[in-house]
Design a protein with these regions (language model features):
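Phosphate/nucleotide-binding beta-alpha loop and adjacent structural elements of enzyme active sites
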Residues: 1-276
């Protein structure tokens, strides 16, 4: 274990003690293939303070996930959606573009190199599974999702498993790269309708527009928005509906995952008022 890893896990332990969190946090990462990112929950799971349910429908990603997390995760090779058969559009493994939605060629061509990233190698008829029908998992407390346009479909078919979920991290699109893909506005309205409020953007991705390239690097953007990772939390204006256990989880995540000390204190003040 590296020194940085030890420090990170000591910080996790300290925050758990500060908020007096006693419950194990169940995390679901749907579309869990690690494409150039370290998830916010990584130190929690690797330290043994939570359990990860890692989903990926692309079987090419499963061995790497099992190697990465070992006994800290239950790795499940499912395409989550509405439980019906769908066509999977299989793209190159390293692009993370494989989807249950057909790539929109006009949208791909708008951005430099995305026609290559979104090139479909083959189409495969697959059976999807509803999140609510996964017997291996119980209640989820934090959900991260990056599933190339299927986020809303999965959420709508997982409301039972999400009934005690306190925070959700979603990839949302400003320019939709797939046909019939819900955009940011549609997802935001639905999340609000089930009692979540937007808290912060963890990352906002911009991309250069074809054919203009910035500094001879097609990955260096100008200003065009492409997509973002947004965090939603249970409505912080309506804490009376939350149990003390849920508030402790929210306080922990706000500090350890989202780097939001003001939100942490907001929840802690409510807990103090309850003498919890």
């Amino acid at each position: 274990m590296s020194l940085d890893t030890k420090k990170a896990q000591m910080r996790i332990m300290k925050v758990i003690e500060q908020v007096q969190l006693s419950d194990l946090i169940n995390v679901a990462d749907i579309g869990a293939a690690s494409i150039n990112e370290t998830p916010v929950y990584s130190d929690l799971v690797m330290g043994g303070y939570g359990h990860l349910f890692a989903f990926d429908g692309d079987s090419r990603q499963i061995p790497a996930l099992r190697k990465l997390y070992g006994d800290h995760a239950t790795v499940l090779n499912h395409f989550l959606a509405d439980g019906d058969p769908h066509t999977a559009y299989i793209c190159r493994e390293d692009t993370g573009m494989t989807s249950l939605l057909k790539p929109n060629q006009t949208a791909l061509a708008f951005f430099n190199n995305f026609s290559l990233f979104g090139k479909v190698l083959k189409e495969e008829r697959i059976q999807t599974t509803r999140l609510d029908d996964i017997d291996e998992i119980g209640d989820l407390h934090f959900v991260k999702m990056d599933v190339q346009g299927s986020e809303l479909n999965i959420l709508k078919n997982g409301l039972k498993k999400l009934s005690n979920c306190v925070a959700v991290q979603l990839e949302v699109s400003f320019i939709c790269l797939y046909e019939n893909q819900p955009g940011f506005g549609e997802i935001d309205m639905w999340m609000r309708s089930i009692g979540f409020a937007p808290h912060r953007f963890l990352d906002i991705k911009r991309w250069s527009i074809t054919p203009t390239i910035n500094g001879n690097n097609f990955r260096r953007p100008f200003n065009q928005l492409l997509e973002a990772d947004i965090v939603y939390v249970r409505d912080p204006l309506n804490m009376k509906k939350r149990t003390s256990g849920q508030l402790k989880m929210l306080a922990f995540m706000s500090e350890a995952f989202f780097d939001s000390p003001d939100l942490t204190i907001h929840y802690l003040r409510e807990l103090v008022s309850r003498k919890s």
